[in-house]
């Protein structure tokens, strides 16, 4: 019930603000915090695009995140994550779910905090 109330408030606030701006709604949090699930619900409610950064990376590379880490290493993954995230954040009026560790990246953090509406889920 609490989640429903919070989602309703997010949607009412966001609909008014996001449709008049170039901002995105960005969901942040550690792995398993609900970024993708809640982001998907919010995007459907607002009838705007949903971008899941981890899914975008998997499509781009053709491997799961786990396989990318195993085969290419974390450094490679973080480089792809940065490029994919910053490119996605250039779009406007979308709901974006970041990867669990993406917000530790200075460029991503600065872009999100300076130019978008963000929600930390825990």
What positions do the PLM features span?
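Conserved phosphate-donor/acceptor-positioning beta-strand/loop module used by diverse small-molecule
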Residues: 112-122
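ATP-dependent small-molecule kinase phosphotransfer cores
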Residues: 49, 53-113
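Hydrophobic anchor at the beta1->P-loop junction of P-loop NTPases
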Residues: 27
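ATP-binding Walker
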Residues: 33
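Walker A/P-loop
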Residues: 36
